[in-house]
Amino acid sequence: MVYKTLFALCILTAGWRVQSLPTSAPLSVSLPTNIMPPTTIWTSSPQNTDADTASPSNGTHNNSVLPVTASAPTSLLPKNISVESREEEITSPGSNWEGTNTDPSPPGFSSTSGGVHLTTTLEEHSLGTPEAGVAATLSQSAAEPPTLISPQAPASSPSSLSTSPPEVFSVSVTTNHSSTVTSTQPTGAPTAPESPTEESSSDHTPTSHATAEPVPQEKTPPTTVSGKVMCELIDMETTTTFPRVIMQEVEHALSSGSIAAITVTVIAVVLLVFGVAAYLKIRHSSYGRLLDDHDYGSWGNYNNPLYDDS
């Protein structure tokens, strides 16, 4: 029982490790996930194990059901789950990468005999919170069980944070004497296009099937407000510069001599006007009315020198 439990935990850990293997052409698939700790139930048959199935749902199971609780980190922040493979080839979903016994296996998982088919699936929850459902199908011979090596780094360690929308992607791992990643198909939100730069010793040519969709960007149409603002600014600048130019021109045009000449001219004009008015008044003035005494009273008109009283 203990052996089966450890075996199941090792397979689960190896599945998580395969997702975080480094590749020559790094393909980072961003998933903002809030992963709740799922309850994983392993269903196995005695001796010749045809299929070990792990699913987060509560299904029917026989007497050899081992409830294993896989503790997953609960996080409120989006996590970036990157799928990487070191010195391995990314091919189409239908092709298999075949290596020899001398080829190094990826760290964290090695098998001695039999073909191991490991399928890791991440599905998006209907509420927007993706849940990790791991379905591992293992076929092996009962004589030589595969030797599993614990991963060097914890598989639950999140990499860099990302803000890209959630997506559904599946990673199918088929191992024949050595574990390799054969297909990576991200679907949903667009990811960075893959560009594998290094090739392994195999004869296959790496092909990439990742579809990159352009992200729609909102472009604001040009408005006429900017033109109005520019016109207003130009008007303000012109209105503020014109008086300054005029004042500068006046300051350069009017010197002290010109100011004195203007002042003297104004004073002369004023004196001339008052002089002409005084001359005309003096010339047309009279010494009084040339009337009789009875018109002015008994005292007579003594103010008029032409008046003759006798």
Swiss-Prot record:
<dbReference type="GO" id="GO:0005886">
    <property type="term" value="C:plasma membrane"/>
</dbReference>
<feature type="compositionally biased region" description="Polar residues">
    <location>
        <begin position="40"/>
        <end position="74"/>
    </location>
</feature>
<feature type="topological domain" description="Cytoplasmic">
    <location>
        <begin position="280"/>
        <end position="310"/>
    </location>
</feature>
<keyword id="KW-0812">Transmembrane</keyword>
<keyword id="KW-0325">Glycoprotein</keyword>
<feature type="compositionally biased region" description="Polar residues">
    <location>
        <begin position="92"/>
        <end position="103"/>
    </location>
</feature>
<comment type="function">
    <text>May regulate TLP1 expression and telomerase activity, thus enabling certain prostatic cells to resist apoptosis.</text>
</comment>
<feature type="transmembrane region" description="Helical">
    <location>
        <begin position="259"/>
        <end position="279"/>
    </location>
</feature>
<keyword id="KW-0333">Golgi apparatus</keyword>
<dbReference type="InterPro" id="IPR031431">
    <property type="entry name" value="PARM1"/>
</dbReference>
<keyword id="KW-0732">Signal</keyword>
<feature type="glycosylation site" description="N-linked (GlcNAc...) asparagine">
    <location>
        <position position="176"/>
    </location>
</feature>
<feature type="region of interest" description="Disordered">
    <location>
        <begin position="40"/>
        <end position="224"/>
    </location>
</feature>
<feature type="glycosylation site" description="N-linked (GlcNAc...) asparagine">
    <location>
        <position position="58"/>
    </location>
</feature>
<feature type="topological domain" description="Extracellular">
    <location>
        <begin position="21"/>
        <end position="258"/>
    </location>
</feature>
<comment type="similarity">
    <text>Belongs to the PARM family.</text>
</comment>
<feature type="glycosylation site" description="N-linked (GlcNAc...) asparagine">
    <location>
        <position position="62"/>
    </location>
</feature>
<keyword id="KW-0967">Endosome</keyword>
<feature type="compositionally biased region" description="Low complexity">
    <location>
        <begin position="150"/>
        <end position="209"/>
    </location>
</feature>
<feature type="signal peptide">
    <location>
        <begin position="1"/>
        <end position="20"/>
    </location>
</feature>
<keyword id="KW-0472">Membrane</keyword>
<keyword id="KW-1003">Cell membrane</keyword>
<dbReference type="GO" id="GO:0005769">
    <property type="term" value="C:early endosome"/>
</dbReference>
<keyword id="KW-1133">Transmembrane helix</keyword>
<keyword id="KW-0597">Phosphoprotein</keyword>
<dbReference type="GO" id="GO:0005654">
    <property type="term" value="C:nucleoplasm"/>
</dbReference>
<dbReference type="Pfam" id="PF17061">
    <property type="entry name" value="PARM"/>
</dbReference>
<protein>
    <recommendedName>
        <fullName>Prostate androgen-regulated mucin-like protein 1 homolog</fullName>
    </recommendedName>
</protein>
<dbReference type="GO" id="GO:0005829">
    <property type="term" value="C:cytosol"/>
</dbReference>
<dbReference type="GO" id="GO:0005770">
    <property type="term" value="C:late endosome"/>
</dbReference>
<feature type="glycosylation site" description="N-linked (GlcNAc...) asparagine">
    <location>
        <position position="80"/>
    </location>
</feature>
<dbReference type="GO" id="GO:0005794">
    <property type="term" value="C:Golgi apparatus"/>
</dbReference>
<dbReference type="GO" id="GO:0010008">
    <property type="term" value="C:endosome membrane"/>
</dbReference>
<feature type="modified residue" description="Phosphoserine">
    <location>
        <position position="298"/>
    </location>
</feature>
<dbReference type="GO" id="GO:0000139">
    <property type="term" value="C:Golgi membrane"/>
</dbReference>
